[in-house]
Structure formats: structure tokens, C-alpha cells
């Protein structure tokens, strides 16, 4: 068998998530169906580096799969790209070692979360940015977001009941910028891994701080007490993008 690593992007609006679902459309299943057709009906299994939720988008998701033959990488990329649904784009494909695993090989991820604070909202962006039409103090959020950088136990920012035992993660970058129109905010988070709904919970908390309904120091309290009830609401998924996955050499 020959193992390939692919970088893909997708519009998450019409997907129930990346991971295969029993009764709903998923990115994994669509790519597996295309690869199985290319492999003359023999089943191909796709593995993903990240499991994005329903409605979450990806600019740089990484997958791997095995084929029973070797094929020119660009020809394979072109075939997989053109025969996959239009809301999936295959950016690149490369041959990798047989023991490479996109999920378990050491890597870091970067996510972006886009907020539309326009009044009225931009209807063309309704599936691609989370609308928040309330007053926001950007400077307060920029101070608060920096408190998330570093190595912390992020129990207070993960979904209640998550099965992961070790909730310590390292965030190497946490930043917030505003576009030139002032309408769109982009939150960026880079780190060695993120817990279930962690980013959406962090953004929901930061928006509450920006709206002056929480103090900036609430971030410190959430990290110290590890209590989800102290954090803000979970932001909607439509503003979240898996931007990039970087592997160590």
C-alpha cells in the first residue's frame, strides 16, 4: 500500500462535520466515496487530523489515505479535486512514509474565528461569520485574549462532559484584529491542540468581555477555577475556520 497526505479545504455549511456520520453528510464520507470510485469500487478509508463540527469550515485540513498502487501526486490531486463535490477543494497531495498518521504525528493547529458586528449584518456572510451586533470594546478583548496564551488547563473552556482526561494545552498565539471597515473581527488561535468546543467557548467569553458583561480578569478566574459555568456562551460554529496544520520535520 502507498500512503498519501492531502491538504484540503471545505465549506462546512452543508456538512454535519468532518467525521463520518450514520445519517448525515460528512467531509470524510464524501472523500472516501470519491477515492473508492477512483479505486474501481474498492473501499478506501480516510483519516483526518482534525474533527471539525457541523457548520465549521476548513482552509487547511490534513488527511491521509492508502492506495494499493502509486500514482503521480498532481494527477491524483486533480482527479480527487475534480471528482469531489464542489464544496470540497483538494489543495495538495504528497507521498508520505507508511507510518505517517495525520492525527498522531506531532503538529500544531491554527484556527480563525470571524465575527460580523455589522448592523445590519451582511447576508452574504451569514454562513461564514458569526453575527454579533452589540457594542464591543476591542481593546478590552485584545487584553483578555493574551491571557489565554501559554500552557494552561483549559477545563473551564471545554464542553461539559468531554471524555478527554488531560485538558492541559499550549496556545502559542492568541490575537484579535479588526478589518479596515471595522465590521469584521478575526480571532486567531495557534497551539498544540484544542479541546472540544474550546475555541468557540473562548470566543463566546471574549465577546462577553468586549460587551462589558464580564471583567477582563474573568479569563484568569476561569483558568484558575476550571469551571465551565464561569465562562461565556458557546459561539456559533459558522465563524470558525481550521486555517492551518503544521507538522514538525
From Swiss-Prot:
Top-level taxonomic group: Bacteria
Family classification: Belongs to the tRNA pseudouridine synthase TruA family.
Record-listed substrate binding positions: 111
Annotated EC: 5.4.99.12
Residue ranges that the Swiss-Prot or TrEMBL entry lists as coiled coil: none
MF (Gene Ontology): pseudouridine synthase activity; RNA binding; tRNA pseudouridine(38-40) synthase activity
Organism of this sequence: Streptococcus pneumoniae (strain ATCC BAA-255 / R6)
A GO BP entry: tRNA pseudouridine synthesis
Catalysis performed (reactions): uridine(38/39/40) in tRNA = pseudouridine(38/39/40) in tRNA
Enzyme class: isomerase
Residues annotated as catalytic: 53 (nucleophile)
Alphabetical list of InterPro entries matching this protein: PsdUridine_synth_cat_dom_sf, PsdUridine_synth_TruA, PsdUridine_synth_TruA_a/b_dom, PsdUridine_synth_TruA_C, TruA/RsuA/RluB/E/F_N
Subunit text: Homodimer.
Gene3D superfamilies: Pseudouridine synthase I, catalytic domain, C-terminal subdomain (3.30.70.660), Pseudouridine synthase I, catalytic domain, N-terminal subdomain (3.30.70.580)
Record protein name field: tRNA pseudouridine synthase A
Function: Formation of pseudouridine at positions 38, 39 and 40 in the anticodon stem and loop of transfer RNAs.
Alphabetized UniProt keyword annotations: Isomerase, tRNA processing
Pfam family membership, one: PseudoU_synth_1
Amino acid at each position: 500500500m502507498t500512503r498519501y497526505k492531502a491538504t484540503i479545504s471545505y465549506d462546512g455549511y452543508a456538512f454535519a462535520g468532518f467525521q463520518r456520520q450514520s445519517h448525515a453528510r460528512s467531509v470524510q464520507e464524501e472523500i472516501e466515496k470519491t477515492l473508492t470510485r477512483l479505486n474501481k469500487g474498492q473501499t478506501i478509508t480516510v483519516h483526518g487530523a482534525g474533527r471539525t463540527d457541523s457548520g465549521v469550515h476548513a482552509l487547511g485540513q490534513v488527511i491521509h489515505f492508502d492506495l494499493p498502487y502509486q500514482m503521480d501526486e498532481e494527477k491524483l490531486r486533480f482527479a480527487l479535486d475534480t471528482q469531489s463535490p464542489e464544496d470540497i477543494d483538494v489543495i495538495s497531495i504528497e507521498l508520505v512514509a507508511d507510518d505517517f498518521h495525520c492525527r498522531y504525528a506531532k503538529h500544531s493547529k491554527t484556527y480563525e474565528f470571524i465575527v460580523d458586528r455589522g448592523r445590519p449584518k451582511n447576508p452574504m456572510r451569514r454562513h461564514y461569520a458569526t453575527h454579533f451586533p452589540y457594542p464591543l470594546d476591542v481593546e478590552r478583548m485584545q487584553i483578555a485574549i493574551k491571557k489565554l496564551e501559554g500552557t494552561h488547563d483549559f477545563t473551564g473552556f471545554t464542553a461539559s462532559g468531554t471524555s478527554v482526561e488531560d485538558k492541559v494545552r499550549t496556545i502559542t498565539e492568541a490575537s484579535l484584529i479588526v478589518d479596515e471597515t471595522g465590521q469584521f473581527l478575526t480571532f486567531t488561535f495557534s497551539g498544540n491542540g484544542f479541546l472540544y468546543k474550546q475555541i468557540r467557548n473562548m470566543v463566546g467569553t471574549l465577546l462577553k468581555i468586549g460587551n462589558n458583561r464580564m471583567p477582563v480578569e474573568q479569563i484568569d478566574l476561569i483558568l484558575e477555577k476550571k469551571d465551565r459555568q464561569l465562562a461565556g456562551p458557546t459561539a456559533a460554529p459558522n465563524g470558525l475556520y481550521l486555517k492551518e496544520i503544521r507538522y514538525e520535520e
